[in-house]
Amino acid sequence: MSNKIYPIGIQNFEKIRNDGYFYIDKTALMYQMVKTGSYYFLSRPRRFGKSLLLSTFEAYFEGKKELFEGLAIEKLETKWEKHPVLHLDLNAEKYDSPERLYDILSRQLTLWEIQYGKGIDENTLSGRFSGVIRRAYEQTGSSVVVLVDEYDKPLLQALGNDVLLDEYRKTLKAFYGVLKSADRYLRFVFLTGVTKFSQVSVFSDLNQLQDITLWPDYGTLCGITLQELLDTFQPEIKILAANNSISYDDAVQRMTRLYDGYHFCINSVGIFNPFSVLNVLKSKVFDNYWFQTGTPTFLVEMLQETEYDLRTLLDGIEAPSSMFSEYRVDSNNPIPLIYQSGYLTIKDFDREFGNYLLQFPNDEVRYGFINFLVPFYTGVRNSDQGFYIGKFVQELRSGDYDAFLTRLQAFFADFTYELNEQTERHYQVVFYIVFKLMGQFTDAEVRSARGRADAVVKTPKYIYVFEFKLHDTAEAALKQIDDKGYLIPYQADGREVIKIGVEFSAEKRNISRWLV
């Protein structure tokens, strides 16, 4: 049994170092940031270590050399100068009114003013912030460090409420704008968040702020690389493997499949989700830990409102580089926010045309997201969908395709009246979701491009080739399978190949018949 402590929910660097928690050393990259620049912005998904990173910078700039014993920066840094640090954490609050945001910022300013004093003519938030920075510099004789954790949290909580969003925008624009005018007093400024909102002029006013979100040098600043995982947690992975009756290599492969796959820049190594890694090693149970901590309800509602074709999202999206530079709240494109929230990641890059390929990073996110979609697009409750998908897979494994299609009929019959009024594309999307979910348990492919069968499911004994027709017959579906040669790739496989033509009735909004 491992005696090391997992820092789940612990974001304070000093506590982690003093109390013997696991810590993966990122201090060489921090040193590089400190020595090559002064103003930074970094976007990363939630629970990826941004808060711990800022806490580590705070300890560094406060000159707490003893906390860095044995870490890379201990050998790199020789001066260990002490600076006043203003650390603003907007992460753990609820922002439901302009007054609430004002009170939270005012409360933080008051804490700083207790330490550095307050000018009698400083009445606005921006005026007080400016005064604190100036006095901290004057009283200590050292330039000031400003760290802002989750600068965009109020804005994210106001999405969908345009009036509230505009109020927050005005408040934060004035507040963060102080950082430009206070430049002569500042040594280092670092803002982190999930999203880069274009309308908040932190980025237009602070032209010296470097957005390192996509920089290859800092692609591994947050999260865990495979090498870091193996170097740090080898004994713990062995325990995880033993508890799940699998080999060490199988445990690593399963962790990789579930939790790896994030890429925050071009040609980056894969990054593991740190929250899921720590939780699976502590609990010794494979589960969707990161996905369960935040439901993407707002993102799914955006997909529905914009009538975004889910099949494109589920298979991968080509996105121009301009999409990464900002997020406009009034945009009809939900993909930038879905990407920045951690549900999509960079998987490839076309250098000639400057386009990125975005896909789900791993199985935790892929199947967590698709499962979450089911109630929104089918009306089937989360508690029931596992029953449906499990039965679908079992019936195809046993060769009982009639039972599978009969159950699929029942699945569509459960739709509410509102869902039955949906468009033809909606039903195509539902078919798509069903077959994608089956991919958790068996080899299931579903078509998004022409020239292939609508769906192919491979089980140990059978290969099923499906063709669905909405405005045509099951006979026409079978003919298309033959005419297009959809069976040819599987003829030498050795498993029994079964072709199935399925006829979907637009009037009944359900499968009407099928032929084999």
Regions found by a protein language model. Name each.
Residues 1-423, 438:
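Phosphate-binding site recognition
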Residues 444-460:
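Catalytic centers of nucleases
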